[in-house]
């Protein structure tokens, strides 16, 4: 994988964490009937998990014990630290915070473990990974933390990396199909936050389940395709290239930004600031104001990470020892 491709994927990671920050900022507008928020929520975490799956190939080749040690330091230690800080500083319920605090890191940790154990099965991963996902769909509590929903995208990301050369031949076709499907989904109001996947959803609303799977997948493919296109068209322009390089640098700190935004956006800004007054028009608030606030706070979180990362204890406890 060349340097250009690494940079463009870091740009994708930047877009993913930007969408997370913007999406969380809509909590400040509880009375706003947002058009943008449900669209963001329909694919932003699938996008994140797909990218994680893409970069998981090396980790999934090491022994389970080594993987457990590595991902415990990188993912579980920040989870424990954030949960303790949240309970102590913000008074959250212990049980609620144990489950919900930085929930995506817990989800990702479990996805790594499941995929690694699956790779021990003496069958092609193209068979075992989908089978393991189907098992997750039907077992009790598989929908906890949306694991059985997001694990699908982790597997897709891994398989994309595994068959990247072959898929490059069809990338324009895949992008075009995804774009058409997502536009249709927008028109039919299918772009909504995914529901918890359990046996009731699978039995009584199978169409809704299939739709939310493909909305998340198509939205992710569109973002990745657009980011690649932007890099190809403008990456060599001096000024634009510097901006893209800056955004790509931010994309390398997504774990830290995700942790920091948990405190700054989720526990402080959106709790104490509520935009209930009709000072601004709903359309301006929805399409411009909140996205600008979320984008600005994403940049703030990035600089908080950069400033605090050199402090060894903070880096270890909150950022997974990021280098």
Region locations from a protein language model:
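Alpha-helical transmembrane segments and their immediate juxtamembrane cytosolic regions
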Residues: 1-323
